[in-house]
């Protein structure tokens, strides 16, 4: 009996060992090994002397974490979370900002589906750090879905939909002369299903005649649905276009964009037209290290000068490493609607991980 028990225990031990060895040899797919985890943080100080609304505060402008993967050689996927919520709006809710996959087999035709940046303006899809200033320009913020004039929830310029894009007419060096983007979206912003069952159509086309230079135009037509207490739905139209130009080469950046919008806000209190224009320059003092910058940033909430708000900005940034930089800006702000002029100072420490 003892011999039988000893043999049984030995057989069991060998079986467990064999299973452990088998588990040890289970291969993890290469695309899982290649998943890239990253993130960034933007710590901010702002002070202003605006009458009746003075400000002297530290803020977490953005904290985000993301994962990128290639589950297939021709397929790219990304998920990104915003961890800090919107402290400027008194919200601390964590939210999903990106979740999409893109088939990238051909440069002339790539197909993206999920939640991602709307293909409207040059500035909207830019990374908040490389965009270069204390915030996105007013016209992009109000007319591309950050704090949209239609009343849409803050969506960081994103929506849920399907997009085609590609590069055309490559030259001998492989540099494309033409780029297009066109997409169909819900029109509601992030993390929300369509409400009025209508879709937004957004597209852009730009030419790149010289290295670093691109000149483009964008169009957007659609609506935002709002469900009422009685169950009915109100559709707020959005008809917008933009003209854009940018030169970015040798650490210099020159960029300007004009956006025009036709369509009321949901309460019909702001008129049915708005527009805005910005022009900026970022110039290197020490290449890839120290830059000075200036921006003219105008937005007219009702396309009338009496509703204009203008930022005249100057600043500088110092890049300690590719993952750490310090930004300082001063702005003189003119608000015609309130007949006020005031000063604004912004300091940011930006880092990537």
Kindly give the residue locations of the regions a language model identified.
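Cleavable N-terminal export/targeting peptides
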Residues: 1-23
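Intrinsically disordered, low-complexity regions enriched for glutamine and histidine
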Residues: 15-19, 78, 179, 258, ...
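Residues in and immediately flanking transmembrane alpha helices
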Residues: 15-16, 86, 128, 335
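Outer-membrane beta-barrel pore domains
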Residues: 49-53, 72, 91, 100-104, ...
